[in-house]
């Protein structure tokens, strides 16, 4: 029986034009024997646009719902997940060659981990790429390490939430993505790290597109009152999980 990685992509109108690139990066993934992917593309709205722009591929599942932001869209897509592993892929980003296979290998080699992340290259408007100099070493990341780094470095984690691959059972136990207008992916990463070990792959796993229309480039994303509120609730949730579950969560390894 084929095992699946369920790739979830939330879509808002300005990012539709980049879906072809995201799909192309999925098609080019060289999967391990016995594995395939499904792509759950979730519109943050109900315009029906996705059916007009996505190819006819049985691995694609299209959904929509009332507008609620990326966290709501991601969590609604979770209802259609059939894989034991859930991978994040934003509509304007692209996976690098072998990214999914490396996630799978990490889970197989380390059944104790609940999630994986990888290195990121920022994809600039002119086509150039820019890396980051604070990537951790290749290997496992202890419970709580992401939160500690995030707190000590101005609310910036040492691993990128846009590269997250997480066990479905753990994702469900944490309630999916946080009900926030933004930073919901960071909230999930810190919550997962609070209750389980993770793994970091130093090979580049994602091209993270920088462009004027992306949500994180908007002025509202850094509006002080909302920003501080988001950071406080993300921090409080992770700390509460760590306190209430000092031994972490018992994980169900992917079959």
PLM features per residue range, with description:
Residues 100-132:
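Conserved donor NDP-sugar-binding/catalytic core segment of glycosyltransferases
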Residues 23, 34-46, 61-66, 91:
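Short beta-strand/loop segment that forms part of the nucleotide-sugar
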Residues 14-29:
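Short, well-formed alpha-helical segments that are part of the catalytic scaffolds
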Residues 64-81:
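Glycine-rich, basic loop-to-helix element that forms the pyrophosphate-binding segment
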Residues 144-165:
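A recurrent flexible, glycine/aromatic-enriched loop bordering the glycosyltransferase active site
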Residues 181-188:
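Acidic donor-binding loop at a coil-to-helix junction in glycosyltransferase catalytic cores
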Residues 86:
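Short aromatic/hydrophobic "clamp" motif used to bind/position activated sugar donors
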Residues 143-146, 204, 208-211, 217-248:
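Catalytic core of nucleotide-sugar-dependent glycosyltransferases
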């Amino acid at each position: 029986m084929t095992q699946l990685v369920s790739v979830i992509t939330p879509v808002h109108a300005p990012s539709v034009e980049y879906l072809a690139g995201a799909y192309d990066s999925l098609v080019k993934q060289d999967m391990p024997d016995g594995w395939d992917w499904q792509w759950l593309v979730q519109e943050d709205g109900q315009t029906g646009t996705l059916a007009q722009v996505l190819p006819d591929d049985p691995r694609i599942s299209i959904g929509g719902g009332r507008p609620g932001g990326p966290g709501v869209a991601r969590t609604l897509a979770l209802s259609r997940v059939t894989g034991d592993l859930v991978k994040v892929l934003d509509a304007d980003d692209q996976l690098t060659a072998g990214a999914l296979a490396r996630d799978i290998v990490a889970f197989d080699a380390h059944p104790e981990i609940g999630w994986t992340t990888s290195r990121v290259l920022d994809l600039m408007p002119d086509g150039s790429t820019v890396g980051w100099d604070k990537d951790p070493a290749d290997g496992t990341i202890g419970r709580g390490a992401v939160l500690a780094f995030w707190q000590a470095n101005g609310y910036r984690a040492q691993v990128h939430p846009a590269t997250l691959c997480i066990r479905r059972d753990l994702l469900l136990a944490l309630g999916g993505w946080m009900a926030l207008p933004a930073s919901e992916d960071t909230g999930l990463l810190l919550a997962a790290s609070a209750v389980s070990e993770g793994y970091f792959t130093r090979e580049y796993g994602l091209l993270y597109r920088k462009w004027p229309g992306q949500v994180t480039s908007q002025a509202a994303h850094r509006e002080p009152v909302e920003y501080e509120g988001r950071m406080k609730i993300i921090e409080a949730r992770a700390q509460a999980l760590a306190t209430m579950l000092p031994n972490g969560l018992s994980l169900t390894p992917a079959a």
